[in-house]
């Protein structure tokens, strides 16, 4: 786990080598400063290489191969191919054996296989990488830069062009060192296309999308292409497997995904909440240890050596799960550390969580995650295993129920409701999803947009989360609805699959996995926040060997109707797969969204923080937010404990933090 920064100069065809060298020498100083801005990500080592028009920089958090041979950048034996890598690659030992005769490995770092695979497979090598990763590779012979990001966007990777230089980095803040002067992109803010597309809400700043790679050459425009995407079966096809066969298939793949993530030359711990996702991971780790699997660098494989960390919110906050987590830990016989998170602790971390996540999320769970990582770091632990990604793949959100019921599940007809009952249940679920977890819904979505989405019920929930009270002048940028931007952000192949081939539940899962998960959840409850305290998070539920199997599980086995209870059981197939590893309490517990506290009173620590940030001057310094509407939201949030008002208030406050720390000038109207 590390931080990377890179540049590729576009000197112009008329530039001499001398001019190019002079430009590069200046940019190298900027590269070093860009590494300073993400220095928290890699305190163990630092390195860079610069050759004419290219520079690659790296700060390292040592996890595997703690020796100097694991330091980066990496190079091939001809010194013509160079790479900087952030993340963990879990099949590195297999590929080392396979490629030992044709590549001279220097050390035992997992990330060293990137160059070896590139030399063996060419550009197709990215598909052979298994894990959480982002990297930049430079092939001097071909004058080719390649930057890529893992399949689900666990690691962040951004790019932009500043003063004739292509810049690529783990975090946007690194671009400030190269002279980036951020400006708000009002169009992407209004239509919220930044939630799905490569474009961010900063003009000219793009993300490498999950499952994509970027290629560029000197004096040529960069180009982004996909190397992987989620696939689902045809909704009319029948699944001939038995339920038990599918249960065993999920269990086998999840166990393997957990097991390979226990390897490290440093201590490894578990993030444990009160839900089935992290509890099943903890249960599997404990079971693997009993069978002799090492947990990180632990010498004794006994569960009592395993450490779990849990946020403990105030008991009356409605968000505390520590009592359940404690019971799970006691049942497993493992150590548990409760990290107390009261309102004062939450408010004190508000601005730092926004700055490091570089994204506004209308919730406060990122501050709890920041406190967790602080506690893990204080214990000398560098790696944690987490539960992110389960809800999206096993249908854990209540909002999925309406889409499950939108059409019969022809792949698993044995579980079908009678048609009359299905229609009644659909009407109720469709009504509930309007006022679901985020409380955002639009009745004005055009019919054409609805058809492109095959009338998915989760669209507004995803597209409008954290919507802003925009100033009236921003309509000059158009009135595209977020729902339209969401579906038009996908290519024609995906839209065709949605309208013709995929079951609506799979469409809903695709939408969540491509938007809310990588751009919100994994930024606020993942790498960006954990690495503030030099903690690497690993996500077994996002192992593509597992998810490609789960994506082919019939919808009715993910969200199963239980006729004897006249209710639905979310994540049914996961519950059955992990039943041997969790308590009866966890097996039977209903899904509860992992969110921070949602009710705060006037005069409290958070209210004081909001009053400090959300002033008339600060709101007007954004340029695109209406002050009167913001005042109204703040009033509702704290005097009426209105959840919509709180979400809107938090979102505005987070944009204010980003604007101030990035030095963004106020947005203005389009010129006449």
Curated annotation (Swiss-Prot):
Pathway: Pigment biosynthesis. The active site is at 2 (nucleophile). One of its GO terms (molecular function) is hydrolase activity. Keywords: ATP-binding, Glutamine amidotransferase, Hydrolase, Nucleotide-binding. It is an enzyme of class 3 (hydrolase). Amidase; part of the gene cluster that mediates the biosynthesis of the yellow pigment chrysogine. the NRPS chyA mediates the condensation of anthranilic acid and alanine into the intermediate 2-(2-aminopropanamido)benzoic acid. The remainder of the pathway is highly branched yielding at least 13 chrysogine-related compounds. The malonyl transferase chyE converts 2-(2-aminopropanamido)benzoic acid and 2-(2-aminopropanamido)benzamidine into 2-(2-(2-carboxyacetamido)propanamido)benzoic acid and 3-((1-((2-carbamoylphenyl)amino)-1-oxopropan-2-yl)amino)-3-oxopropanoic acid, respectively. This is Amidase chyE. The lineage of its organism: Eukaryota, Fungi, Dikarya, Ascomycota, Pezizomycotina. The gene is chyD.
